[in-house]
Amino acid sequence: MVLGDKKRAERNRTLTISQDEIPTLSRMVSSKNDALSSGITDTIINADLMDVIDAIPDKCANLIIVDPPYNLSKDFHGVTFNAMSSDSYEEYLREWFYKVCDKLSDNGTLYMCGDWKCTSSMQKVISERLSIINRITWQREKGRGAMSNWKNGMEDIWFAVKKTNDYYFNVEAVMTKRRVLAPYRDNGKPKDWDETENGNFRTTYPSNFWDDISVPFWSMPENTDHPTQKPEKLYAKLVLASSKPGDLVFDPFLGSGTSAVVAKKLNRHYCGIEINKEYCLWAAKRIMNSETDKEIQGYQDGVFWERNTLNIQKKGNYKKPRELNTVCQQPSLFS
């Protein structure tokens, strides 16, 4: 069997795994016992989260990214999740979330992804253990329309910490570059924007509304057949803002490995737990590929570009973001 073996168009770049690659990739995936005997740094652990979480060292992770099953009935290539009542879903979250929080360092950060249906349950459970700093809304621009409802094109990402007066947040590492539609000049000179032969652009501070990130699709080399894969660009913002090089990024629902791949590309360590062996192999191949390909689509020379600017990024005729002091210890936003 070839993993991800479907009939695909010639230009389709979705990840596949050949039969010959499986032994090599399997050696990159740890079982529960292997991981616990040799350490968790830079590991993919193929196990049920509840079977292994107690053995993960407490306070080991500087950043935790959580993309759990939403409260929807879905088949993850043989591993199914069934929708339940809101109360039952909250109890499901508590079963593992409290334990996951124990793995967060005292000045660490946790992000959790959710959709409109489960996000209120997530907010409630997160607040029982951590302090919520903000909610990011990601406009993912994908999803089927409906005749009797609005198309679901948004997801939430909850931003939470243990200590509101002591957590790392580097906003200068996640600046965004956008086209200037109505450029303003002061004495004939561009004001707060750059004028280039490829267009007018402004480097700005990011907000909590993200509309510059596409869901992975068939022409992107990061794409897999995972039904709910998150984009590398999305996780790159979280990793760059809330961790330092050499920090450990922990993902208890690794899926096809986006958090681990991004961590490696950005010189962080990773640890991920995933129950589906096939997904673990996809993650392993993506990590192997990242040894020679560090590109994160939409992130170029230390700045995040808006959609549909790839050709301009490659031309490189623009100003890089100014060099700024990147150490930021944030006060509470709610005091």
Predicted regions, residues:
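S-adenosyl-L-methionine
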Residues: 21-54, 284-325
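Core catalytic lobe of class I
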Residues: 1-24, 31-282, 328-335
